Curated annotation (Swiss-Prot):
InterPro entries: Trm112-like. GO terms for cellular component: cytosol. Belongs to the UPF0434 family. It holds the Pfam family Trm112p. The lineage of its organism: Bacteria, Pseudomonadati, Pseudomonadota, Gammaproteobacteria, Pseudomonadales. This is UPF0434 protein PST_2635.
Length: 61
């Protein structure tokens, strides 16, 4: 994913920052505890497509 795009993207719910997961398959919002999928390099920023982070993922810095 293009780093310039990542700089301007925000969580669609809280408008907070997103972090690209290490495997680059998800954008993580720590504030809401959600992971938005990245499919074929395109972020899917729909709440209905996001998964809830588990406790370990929420605590991971």
């Amino acid at each position: 994913m293009d780093t310039k795009l990542l700089d301007i993207l925000a969580c669609p719910l809280c408008k907070g920052p997103l972090k690209l997961a290490e495997d680059k398959s998800e954008l993580i919002c720590k504030a809401d505890g959600l992971a938005f999928p990245v499919r074929d390099g395109i972020p899917v920023m729909l709440e209905s497509e996001a998964r809830t982070l588990d406790v370990d993922e929420r605590l991971d810095k």
